[in-house]
Amino acid sequence: MQIMVNDEAHEVSARTLAALIDELGYSGARIATALNGRFVPVTQRAETLLPDGAQVEIVAPMQGG
């Protein structure tokens, strides 16, 4: 399936947001996620299905000083 992750095209086999996070190597990381412009909390990632052509944003917090 073809989706966009952080504005980059990806061909993935994942069907849920949680599976996508694992497939892209983010499992265990503290991240925020959005699907098609809507925030998806960690508690809903396993049940959130990815449609073909989905726009996914994965954001990791940054420390500053």
Question: What does each model-found stretch correspond to?
Answer:
Residues 1-64:
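Ubiquitin-like/PB1-type beta-grasp interaction modules and other compact soluble beta-rich domains
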